[in-house]
């Protein structure tokens, strides 16, 4: 890294004012900041000095997402091999899932960061690190069969209209990943719901077995179509069920929650308030006793482990930019988020 640092210092004058590559200063600054801690710090005014900056915050959030992402990759392979009748080892299932998910991660980052680089160049501003988190969140909240071109369109839409039009990182009032999910759901509903999107029916480099028209329902989807309340099982906790790539494993998500809380990046009040609010609303619907509504009959604890609720409580409600900042607002905002 020292050699790279020396090389960047050597070419840096070319990107400063008066240099022959001054037009690309924001690109150079973004690349340098990504690799090394910025050398400039605020010394006056109302700034609060701390050992952590935005790059470290975003890096910690990405690290906290890794357990859920890795398990999601394995689960993609597990669901494919289980429902197609193919045989494969743990390693083969993980590699299959890795190869299925990796293109979505690449598309998300290429499109999102590409737009941020273009906007930074146009506005002659530094490139921010905000999309480091959004770029990994977006592939984790979509089904494995979501087409890459649709993911690219949704990512571009959310970065432009939910972030850049408000001023970029730290200025946006909406969560970019959630806007991506909402755009996909309303613009391409058949690619985000139903029974044909949750399990891949394709082979990847000879692994797995190709099955045309493979349909597998999620526990909530099965409850909606059959009218039968799903029985609680440990698979709902471990995550060995069909669902969006990174949202199924409660255990992996809670490992990420521990990382966020231990480093102080997320507020425990926000997380607990979402879980408490969700459990309370589920209990209310149970008490009302809606006989014709299967979801209202589900036990409160099943609501907390299905449908991405846990993922939303840990990673969406605690978003550093769009979440509440004061203690009272953290509690009330989270309580309002949980019923949704």
Please provide the spans of the model-predicted regions.
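A beta-strand-loop signature enriched in Asp, Gly, Thr, and Trp
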Residues: 271-327
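Generic transmembrane alpha-helix motif of multi-pass integral membrane proteins
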Residues: 134-144, 254-260, 311-316
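Residue-level detector of conserved catalytic or cofactor/ligand-binding positions
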Residues: 328-339
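Long hydrophobic alpha-helical segments that form multi-pass transmembrane helix bundles
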Residues: 170-254
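Membrane-interface helix-loop-helix junctions at boundaries between adjacent transmembrane segments
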Residues: 126-207
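N-terminal signal-anchor module of multipass membrane proteins
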Residues: 1-105
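Structural signature of hydrophobic alpha-helical transmembrane segments
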Residues: 94-110, 145-154, 236, 240-250, ...
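C-terminal ends of transmembrane helices
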Residues: 42-48, 112-124, 160-170, 255-263, ...
């Amino acid at each position: 890294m020292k050699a790279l640092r020396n090389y960047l210092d050597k070419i840096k004058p070319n990107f400063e004012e008066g240099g022959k590559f001054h037009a690309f200063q924001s690109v150079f600054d973004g690349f340098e900041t990504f690799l090394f801690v910025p050398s400039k710090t605020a010394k006056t005014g109302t700034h609060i000095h701390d050992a952590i900056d935005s790059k470290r915050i975003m890096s910690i959030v990405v690290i906290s997402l890794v357990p859920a992402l890795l398990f999601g990759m394995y689960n993609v392979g597990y669901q494919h091999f289980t429902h197609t009748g193919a045989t494969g080892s743990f390693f083969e299932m993980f590699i299959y899932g890795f190869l299925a998910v990796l293109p979505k991660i690449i598309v998300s980052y290429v499109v999102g960061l590409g737009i941020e680089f273009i906007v930074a160049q146009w506005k002659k501003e530094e490139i921010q690190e905000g999309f480091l988190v959004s770029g990994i969140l977006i592939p984790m909240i979509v089904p494995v069969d979501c087409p890459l071109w649709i993911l690219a369109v949704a990512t571009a839409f959310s970065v432009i209209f939910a972030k850049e039009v408000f001023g970029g990182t730290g200025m946006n009032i909406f969560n970019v990943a959630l806007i991506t999910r909402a755009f996909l759901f309303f613009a391409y509903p058949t690619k985000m719901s139903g029974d044909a999107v949750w399990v891949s029916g394709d082979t990847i480099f000879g692994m797995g077995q190709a099955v045309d028209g493979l349909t597998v329902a999620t526990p909530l989807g099965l409850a909606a179509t059959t009218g039968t309340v799903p029985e609680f099982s440990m698979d709902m906790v471990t995550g060995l069920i069909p669902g969006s790539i990174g949202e199924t494993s409660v255990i992996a998500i809670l490992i990420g929650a521990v990382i966020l809380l231990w480093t102080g990046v997320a507020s425990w009040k926000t997380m607990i308030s979402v879980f408490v609010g969700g459990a309370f609303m589920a209990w209310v619907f149970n008490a009302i006793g809606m006989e014709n509504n299967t979801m209202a009959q589900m036990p409160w604890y099943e609501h907390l482990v299905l449908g991405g609720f846990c993922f939303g409580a840990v990673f969406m409600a605690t978003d550093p930019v769009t979440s509440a900042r004061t203690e009272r607002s953290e509690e009330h905002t989270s309580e309002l988020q949980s019923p949704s």
